[in-house]
């Protein structure tokens, strides 16, 4: 065998070493995504922590179900902060450290994608609730959601790196998935299974107050933040490699950022 495929592991290793400090950024983003659904569920239902951990719908679904302006405002702030920081994080993966998007257009594009993902997640949560005790229907919803996430796996990276809109990014994400089918599927499956295992372990062991559960939740955020960081690096390298080898058209317009990897 010859060609760029031989250099992919080395490229991933090089980026992981050069960008290792970004693991703390990834942990912060994971902690935000972990804490917000729990907080919105508490604002909606005021249940004990153990119950909230076992049954979180997400801030958008909670805001609609509760018809609460407070939860809606909470969701909007989360969405704005999350998109802002996510853009800075992706820019940092392919260039110097950033905490913010490159410009307003990039921010709005990423915000639109994040909103779409939240809407799909909320619809899936409601569908699972409607499925009730029918495991076949619930599993079908989960499988459909997993397929959707597989299609858009690279979309946020592409918005930032290739400077395109969300619809174009989804189309390019699908092309990237097709060009890197096996590694993309393995990464999504690994992150999903590890995340589910971590959540399941937390659900089984959290029975007390927030103060008693906090250390275990922090450990989960640190471990899964590290896992997500590694997955992000691999996915970014896979996307750039697919673009640079001509398997995607058009090539990323901001190719200068990609050369840093």
What residue ranges belong to the model's regions?
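Hydrophobic alpha-helical membrane segments
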Residues: 1-261
């Amino acid at each position: 065998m010859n060609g760029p495929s031989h250099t992919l592991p080395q490229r991933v290793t090089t980026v992981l070493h050069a960008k290792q400090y970004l693991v703390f950024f990834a942990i912060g983003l994971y902690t935000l995504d972990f804490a917000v659904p729990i907080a919105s569920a508490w604002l909606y239902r005021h249940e004990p922590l153990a119950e909230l951990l076992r049954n979180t719908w997400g801030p958008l679904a909670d805001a609609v179900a509760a018809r609460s302006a407070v939860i809606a405002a909470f969701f909007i702030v989360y969405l704005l902060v999350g998109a802002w920081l996510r853009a800075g994080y992706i820019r940092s993966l392919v260039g110097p450290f950033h905490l913010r998007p490159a410009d307003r257009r990039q921010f709005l594009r990423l915000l639109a994608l994040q909103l779409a993902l939240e809407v799909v997640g909320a619809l899936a949560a409601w569908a699972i609730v409607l499925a009730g005790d029918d495991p076949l229907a619930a599993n079908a919803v989960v499988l459909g959601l997993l397929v959707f996430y597989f299609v858009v796996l690279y979309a946020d990276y592409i918005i930032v790196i290739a400077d395109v809109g969300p619809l174009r990014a989804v189309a390019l994400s699908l092309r990237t998935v097709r060009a890197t089918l096996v590694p993309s599927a393995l990464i999504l499956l690994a992150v999903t299974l590890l995340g589910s295992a971590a959540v399941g372990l937390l659900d089984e062991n959290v029975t007390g107050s927030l103060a008693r559960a906090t250390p275990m939740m922090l450990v989960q955020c640190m471990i899964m933040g590290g896992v997500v960081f590694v997955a992000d690096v691999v996915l970014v390298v896979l996307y750039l490699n697919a673009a640079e080898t001509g398997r995607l058209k058009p090539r990323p317009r901001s190719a200068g950022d990609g050369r840093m990897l």
